[in-house]
Swiss-Prot record:
Belongs to the frog skin active peptide (FSAP) family. Frenatin subfamily. This is Frenatin-2.1D. Keywords: Amphibian defense peptide, Immunity, Innate immunity, Secreted. Disulfide bonds: none annotated. It comes from Discoglossus sardus. One of its GO terms (biological process) is innate immune response.
Length: 12
């Protein structure tokens, strides 16, 4: 995902 490539589907 985003926000530091976190393993979660964050919007962005």
């Amino acid at each position: 995902g985003t926000l530091g490539n976190l393993p979660a589907p964050f919007p962005g």
